[in-house]
């Protein structure tokens, strides 16, 4: 029975499609979904200039898109067991097409944010349908130490290519072309689904016991927290009434979530996710810290490249290539580390990822000068890419091994809320406030008037503080993995 379940096949394909290319077709479709988005950050300055947005408005679109992906994780298997693979992929593809058409022309922000959430849901559902159907092709034993590195290779490659393509279209004069490219790719996906795939499903489980209200509350809480952290500096934090109102709504939303979590028979996120698994809470705390540190990419790095070095959009996009190489290297190292070298633990992979992150931060600290060749940035950006992939894979595999299957996707939802949305928002808010503080201090104490020098000093100072955080994380990991701790007996009270 177990051999039959673990035998790889793709019965949803029509007979004329060769079996050897079937998984590659689904890998292509997964890449098409991962390339999609609702607002593309590559041509950020061009979008701001054309639409009259603030930088915070575009970042909020990204956070809403990520929030839609994160909050949908508990529904992935429920939808898989309710609808056929072709139905879900077709619906996801059509949704991506419609949202890309609308977001290319809509400027009303609340509606734009809602469309970003919907696109995120379609994106993750389509990707999951493809990757879950070819999992046995990647690893016949469903070994997550194999699957997660391959999955991150696909996802991180798509993120890098999306940034490069959208920046190129912005560079040649029309950022909307990226939307048309995604629409064209999804039309190809629909053509493949129409001609090569038929409806097939093992079971037909009704969508009973789904806490839809709970799902909406979790999504609302993420949007409120992202708004607070994204727009906090713009509205002068708690000196303005807007932040007070949103904070009040966030507290009310959190209270409603906790009430439903403890009183609903089938809550969207079970309280057992937080109480019944030993390592879940440390993993969630650590991912917030690491994502806050990685937020340097969106604030310090962008300020340095644009304000200090005067790089344009296309020059910045060319710097994505060393990041992509680092991503691939990090995935390869993680695969070898966890799969082939069994004596190395996840904690030691975390130490390696933290070393990569520390090397990125320290190298950037010494490179922050008003005059710098672009080639000098390749090495630190490689380190950043390797650090991100190593740490993401390590945390995800650790979470998988810490939880049972019933609660894993709920835990994965919380993990990605913090990983993709909240952690990065906290980091960006901290760095934005830090830049303002140190820029004002440079003018006040050192009487510096040159804007490039002021920004370089501010960025350099913040990179220095982040280096101390990386050192503290590295020491913490090494102490956790020390022989005296691993070999001592557990206390008995």
Walk through the language-model features, giving the residues of each.
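Helix-to-loop junctions at the C-terminal end of transmembrane segments
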Residues: 71-85, 170, 330-346
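Hydrophobic transmembrane-helix bundles of small-molecule transporters
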Residues: 171-284
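Helix-breaking motifs and short loop linkers at transmembrane-helix boundaries and internal kinks
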Residues: 52, 84, 102-111, 310, ...
């Amino acid at each position: 029975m177990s051999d039959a379940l673990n035998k790889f096949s793709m019965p949803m394909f029509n007979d004329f499609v060769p079996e050897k290319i079937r998984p590659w077709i689904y890998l292509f479709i997964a890449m098409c979904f991962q390339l999609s988005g609702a607002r593309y950050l590559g041509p950020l300055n061009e979008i701001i200039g054309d639409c009259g947005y603030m930088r915070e408005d575009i970042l909020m679109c990204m956070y809403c898109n990520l929030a839609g992906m994160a909050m949908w994780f508990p529904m992935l298997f429920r939808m898989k067991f309710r609808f056929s693979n072709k139905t879900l992929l077709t619906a996801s593809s059509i949704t991506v097409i419609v949202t890309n058409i609308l977001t290319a022309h809509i400027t009303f922000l609340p509606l734009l944010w809602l469309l970003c959430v919907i696109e995120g849901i379609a994106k993750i559902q389509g990707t999951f349908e493809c990757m879950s159907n070819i999992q046995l092709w990647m690893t016949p034993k469903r070994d997550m130490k194999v699957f997660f590195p391959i999955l991150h290779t696909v996802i991180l490659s798509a993120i890098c290519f999306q940034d490069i393509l959208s920046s190129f279209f912005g560079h040649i004069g029309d950022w909307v072309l990226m939307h048309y490219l995604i629409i064209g790719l999804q039309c190809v996906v629909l053509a493949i689904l129409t001609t090569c795939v038929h409806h097939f499903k093992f079971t037909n489980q009704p969508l009973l016991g789904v806490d839809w209200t709970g799902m909406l509350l979790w999504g609302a809480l993420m949007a409120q927290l992202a708004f607070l952290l994204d727009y906090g500096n713009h509205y002068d934090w708690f000196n303005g009434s807007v932040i007070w109102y949103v904070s009040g709504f966030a507290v009310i939303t959190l209270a409603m979530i906790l009430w439903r979590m403890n009183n609903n028979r089938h809550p969207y996120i079970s309280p057992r996710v937080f109480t019944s698994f030993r390592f879940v809470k440390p993993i969630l705390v650590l991912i917030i810290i690491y994502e806050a540190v990685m937020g340097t990419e969106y604030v310090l790095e962008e300020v340095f490249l644009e304000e200090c070095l005067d790089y344009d959009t296309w020059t910045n996009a060319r710097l994505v290539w060393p990041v992509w190489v680092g991503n691939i290297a990090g995935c390869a190292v993680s695969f070898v580390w966890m799969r082939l070298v069994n004596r190395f633990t996840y904690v030691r992979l975390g130490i390696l990822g933290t070393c990569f992150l520390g090397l990125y931060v320290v190298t950037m600290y010494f490179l922050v000068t008003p005059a710098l060749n672009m080639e000098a940035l390749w090495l630190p950006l490689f380190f950043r890419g390797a650090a991100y992939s190593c740490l993401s894979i390590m945390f995800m595999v650790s979470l998988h091994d810490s939880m049972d299957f019933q609660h894993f996707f709920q835990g994965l939802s919380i993990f990605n809320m913090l990983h993709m949305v909240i952690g990065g928002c906290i980091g960006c808010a901290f760095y934005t406030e830090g830049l303002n503080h140190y820029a004002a201090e440079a003018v006040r104490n050192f009487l510096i008037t040159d804007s490039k020098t002021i920004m370089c000093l501010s960025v350099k100072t913040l990179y220095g503080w982040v280096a101390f955080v990386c050192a503290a994380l590295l020491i913490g990991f090494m102490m956790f993995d020390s022989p005296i701790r691993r070999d001592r007996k557990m206390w008995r009270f």
